[in-house]
Curated annotation (Swiss-Prot):
GO terms for molecular function: ATP binding; UDP-N-acetylmuramate-L-alanine ligase activity. SUPFAM superfamilies: MurCD N-terminal domain, MurD-like peptide ligases, catalytic domain, MurD-like peptide ligases, peptide-binding domain. Its EC number is 6.3.2.8. Cell wall formation. One of its GO terms (biological process) is cell wall organization. Belongs to the MurCDEF family. This is UDP-N-acetylmuramate--L-alanine ligase. It is an enzyme of class 6 (ligase). Signal peptide: none annotated. It catalyses: UDP-N-acetyl-alpha-D-muramate + L-alanine + ATP = UDP-N-acetyl-alpha-D-muramoyl-L-alanine + ADP + phosphate + H(+).
Amino acid sequence: MRGHYHFIGIGGIGMSGLARILLQQNLSVSGSDIAFNYTIEGLIKSGATIYKGHSPSYITSGSTVIYSSDIKTDNPEYLAAKNLQCSLLHRAELLALLTRQKKSLAVTGTHGKTTTSSLLATTLLEANCDSSFAVGGIIPQFQSNAKHGLGDLFVFEADESDRSFLKYFPYGAIVTNIDNDHLNSYENSEDVLIQSFQQFTSQISSPNHLFWCGDDTHLKFLNGIGQSYGFGEHCNWRISNVFQKDFNLEFDLEGNEKKYPSIKLNLIGRHNLLNGAAVFGLAMSLNISEASIRHTFERFCGVLRRCEYKGEFENTIFLDDYAHHPTEIQTTLEGIRKAIKSKRLIAVFQPHRFSRIKDCLGMYGKIFNNADEVFVTDVYGAGETPIEGISQQQIIQEISENSSVPVKYVPRTALGHKLSEFIQPLDVIVTLGAGDVTKVASETLSLLENGKRF
């Protein structure tokens, strides 16, 4: 690969990772975004030229211009690239080009991609594979979401949300699950969604390195292909004897005609037991030593915005999680509840996108049952046009009608003040959502530390 690459919307987690990989290959990179963040600052330090806002003047003839599904076709830089007859590549097309140079290991599925791919990437790097990776979150151990390695393996997230995962032809893969999310990309049809996953798995060149969740009935089309993992007796890799103490898991795994007792994983929740089993099995199939895998699992620090510890004040703990789909919220709260036992758990939820709320109505009623209090704030639209009759109010009503957990609306601008007045010593607060609710913990802690006491 050579030439100059320009990223429209370079600050996004997927785009910034690809830009970082190109920079590490000593390629010329520029980009633009409407706002600067710490990710962009890191890219600038690595040699990228980045502009604030969008302008056709940022596009130069002969550049390869990268865009994502979030970039509209009337974007001035997109239009300028077309007018200058620049090579235009969707983010997934660039990732496909990069992964073709290696033995690529894709992680796909509706939920769990980022944690699973990050754990897999960390496991391989800790085993001195010098693998490449491009994941959807920042791995604290590397302070990065991407790396260009000299080894022959490349771990990456294959995003199903916009159907772009069909552009990949990986060497091996993990399929975590299939759930009814992003159906607007699949003609609003679950059948089309499942058929797309069937097509993706048919594109894997080494099915011996395909691992899929055997507990997910949507994945039954994979019976007899690759290796399944889960809790069921029918799974090739079976989880048993689970024990969770605080924010750590311990479990047994049986697979490959062998038992692997007392695996320790520095994560919480049933979903992460499944993620861990998938990574353990795939790593073993790649001849990574059991001792190395165990060592990594014990030391793995998770991913930013995945049940991330944000701080505490007088024994009140603040956590933050990216969960915004009902299934993700429920599993996250279940894991936290097991970790904190009887402590009061306050869930602060920021609904994400009007279209997702509409698609998921009927699923919110009981997902907060492991919380003691629920605050629901304004919808984070993520650029979507509001849908008439769809707002946070429908979610609040659904919870009120189906659960005994107290739920109330709090405007986004008032969340910090409300929490600083409401919380008590030993409470655990978790913010949930893919938007700016991630800032609420620091906002609240700042108020508390500056004299706003219990």
